[in-house]
Amino acid sequence: MEYHPSSQSPQVNPGMESQQGGYTYTYQQPAPPNSLHLQHPSILTRLPPLSSSVVSPSLASLPPFTPTSTYHSIAALTPPSYPQSSSAPSNNSYTIVPSPHDPSNAYSMHHVLQNTAPQSVPSPSPIEMVPPSPPKTGSNNSAPVTGKTVQSGNALNNSGLVKRQARKRTKTGCLTCRKRRIKCDERKPICYNCIKSKRQCEGYTHFPRPSGTFTASRRIPVSSLLSEPAPHGLAGQPTHPTFLYYIQSVAPSLCLWDACHFPPLSPYSSFSSIYWSSTVPELALRNPNISVALYAFASAKRHLTDDAVAFARQARVALTNITTTDSLLILVLLAVTQLYIPKSDIQLFNFAVDQVVKFDASLMTSPSDEIITYLLRRMFIRQVVLAGIVKPLASGLNPLPLLKCDLPPATTPTAVLDESLFHLGLRKLCHEKGLEPEFTKWSKNCPIDKADLPRLALLMIHAVFTSPVSLAQWVELILQNPDPTPAIHIARACLLAVHGVVDLGDLQMKVEKCVQSCEERQLQATISNFSTEVAQTNSSALAIGCQ
């Protein structure tokens, strides 16, 4: 909506009632997504709550902005309200929403937060949005101008509007698809084109919001959420110390663990960074159940046991059916919290293990749901491992079914070793102590670099809980390493781990041949070095004798 002083109106104080007749109101439709109108700073951080119909915690479920004639108003820096003249009553229901800093505390977002589902948000007509234009002051009493835009400093002309619409098509897709000049399906946070072509999705510069709001067409960074108080009606508190701890410590740690496992350019890697650092905090600000579960998890990481117990009890009431990735996120956060509190909820933990393993793939509505489920499984297994390293898990907790989750096969020796990290704590869980003397004895007989011992131990532990078929394939792959020495130790560790469990005769023969070959080369190298040293000593002695 734009208002401009009429050339025929007297120049008087705009606060006077008589000035109402001195303005011409025009309506321009549709409003451009990046309007140049000034907006209140709080509008840029106001996020509507997720509707119950949204099944994905990512932004993929939000509908794209369409150039249809919908204009949903949010109070920005609207012009001052001019009271209606008593002589010219109006039936217009348009009212200006007060600022959130209004001392009257009358600020309310009920007109924004009623229902964000796109199918239930009506499109108000221009009559509902714009107050009727009073008749021009003059002798001809002509009809008010309602369809023509009056030019002003902040108004967009028609050509500018056309440019904005034409440019919008290239700014809503991901950066990778825009560089490739192909149509992007705009799934968030990674489009399906990048997943299918195995390219790194560089993300979006435009994240559409539900059609019930009209905000700046840009993705709200988490840093801006931390600098402003939480808008009225949202669940999370961006300035809460526990929330800040998650943003500054927990989320980077989760991203780092995933980055160590996934290839740098894989979609999983970029998805993980966006999901833990941005999507989950934004969900916590909108959804009170996710917020409480996140606070419980972060409090446990901060070693605030009492807070973790209190938050976990509060969130436990909200658990019903696990049918979406949102509810799965809540369940995993609460289950991980049980690993760090004194009196663990064994029933909740084992229920979470069962749900994570058996989560119905038919409920997934997009590729992002599948990736989110995979990330949550990974995170759950990893937290069990890390907790088991610190202390034995509480009696009754049974995380072993997590090992049956489908994991992608390792393709490099480094991936094999990294894969074993997820199962490091399971040795204590299963009390597999019989392997340690064998491994220690073998290590003493075949000394290696001490820096390799932890990685070899990880692989040996992992081999206990790995199927023999994949273990044999991994050993075959490791033996192809150009440097045979670490490969031999890794293969021997695997064979010790599965000794008496499965017959790997052929594989053992290959390992023994590799060991023998390596020992022969080491012996030859030792003899060669000794011969060189003897020759140098003799030549030095001859030189001294000649002097």
Curated annotation (Swiss-Prot):
Compositionally biased residues, Polar residues: 1-18, 136-160
Compartment annotation: Nucleus
Biased composition (Pro residues): 121-135
Low complexity compositional bias, start-end: 19-29, 83-94
SMART domains documented for this protein: GAL4 (SM00066)
Regions recorded as binding DNA: 174-201
GO cellular component, one term: chromatin
Keywords associated with the record: DNA-binding, Metal-binding, Nucleus, Transcription, Transcription regulation, Zinc
GO BP: galactose-specific flocculation; negative regulation of flocculation; negative regulation of transcription by RNA polymerase II; regulation of transcription by RNA polymerase II
Region feature (Disordered): 1-41, 80-165
Predominant subcellular localization, coarse grouping: nucleus
MF GO annotations: DNA-binding transcription factor activity, RNA polymerase II-specific; RNA polymerase II cis-regulatory region sequence-specific DNA binding; zinc ion binding
Full protein name: Uncharacterized transcriptional regulatory protein C15D4.02
Classification lineage: Eukaryota, Fungi, Dikarya, Ascomycota, Taphrinomycotina
